[in-house]
Structures are given as C-alpha cells and as structure tokens.
C-alpha cells in the first residue's frame, strides 16, 4: 500500500473515489426530492 501511495498522487485517489460517492449521494437526494426515494 505504501508503494502504490508513493507512485499514485493522493489527490488522484481522492478524485477517483470522490466522484462516484458524490454522484450516488446526488442521485439519492434527487430521488428522495422527486418522491421516488420513498418508494425505493
């Protein structure tokens, strides 16, 4: 883990893991706001 962290920039890991999380949270809030989240 230490070797891969040294080669791969930390901001790149944060971006790759952050975008899907933000997308899922956005879809979740959008669905609940539209009223579709309650049915799920």
Curated annotation (Swiss-Prot):
Under the subunit heading, UniProt states: PSII is composed of 1 copy each of membrane proteins PsbA, PsbB, PsbC, PsbD, PsbE, PsbF, PsbH, PsbI, PsbJ, PsbK, PsbL, PsbM, PsbT, PsbX, PsbY, PsbZ, Psb30/Ycf12, at least 3 peripheral proteins of the oxygen-evolving complex and a large number of cofactors. It forms dimeric complexes.
The record's comment on protein family reads: Belongs to the PsbJ family.
Q: How does it sit in the membrane?
A: Single-pass membrane protein
Q: What's its job?
A: One of the components of the core complex of photosystem II (PSII). PSII is a light-driven water:plastoquinone oxidoreductase that uses light energy to abstract electrons from H(2)O, generating O(2) and a proton gradient subsequently used for ATP formation. It consists of a core antenna complex that captures photons, and an electron transfer chain that converts photonic excitation into a charge separation.
Would the keyword Thylakoid be found if you checked this record's keyword annotation?
A: yes
This entry carries the following GO cellular component terms, namely:
chloroplast thylakoid membrane; photosystem II reaction center
Tell me which UniProt keywords the record has, alphabetically. Chloroplast, Membrane, Photosynthesis, Photosystem II, Plastid, Reaction center, Thylakoid, Transmembrane, Transmembrane helix
Q: Which domain of life is it from?
A: Eukaryota
Q: Where are the transmembrane segments?
A: 8-28
Compartments annotated for it: namely: Plastid, Chloroplast thylakoid membrane
Respond yes or no to whether keyword NAD is given for this record.
no
What Pfam families does the record point to? PsbJ (PF01788)
Query: Which source organism?
Result: Cucumis sativus
Q: What is this protein called?
A: Photosystem II reaction center protein J
Give the gene name.
psbJ
């Amino acid at each position: 883990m230490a070797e891969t962290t040294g080669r791969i920039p930390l901001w790149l890991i944060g971006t790759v893991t952050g975008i899907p999380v933000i997308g899922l949270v956005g879809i979740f809030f959008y669905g609940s706001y539209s009223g579709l989240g309650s049915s799920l």
